[in-house]
């Protein structure tokens, strides 16, 4: 049923940028080629994101055959994700505050990169132009390493917070923002769990959102991975 629901969602979502692209191409009132190309490029970026979500969703059931856990420099994975979103950072004139991310953690760089992509995409999407995204790492008293991704965007209403990781849930943002799909955080949560990581969100409407990813110590991680 979960797979069926995802396919229905995916087909519905991917039609939107396809139709938008066709309208841009066939609009006789648009003579500015540069504008057309720019807007079509944005729609293609949306399609690419949806394709990647479908690809990773299809791999959830065979996760054990498609991951490789090893010591990774978190800074490398973070910077690669930031680079993939460079056009959005530049286009919206966003400030990036990147500090103390060069910690070694046990993870799969490919899957963690996808998780970070979902979080960064949301941070950029729901933060106004000239806003700020802060990314840093620290270590808690429990010796767990924590990656923080914080924005000063619109935030999430308190009543929506308990459901943000549910499949297809968009809450108040979904009613205001047509491009909200409710799949990014769901996939991020599922993948984090399979990697032995914990992901949580703190947010205040009108102030911003902070996402935290907790990385277990080596011995604790091995116990979690076995489960």
Indicate where each model-derived feature is located.
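Acidic ATP/Mg2+-coordinating residue in the GHKL
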Residues: 151
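Short helix-loop "hinge" at the ATP-lid/N-box region of the Bergerat-fold HATPase_c
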Residues: 123-124
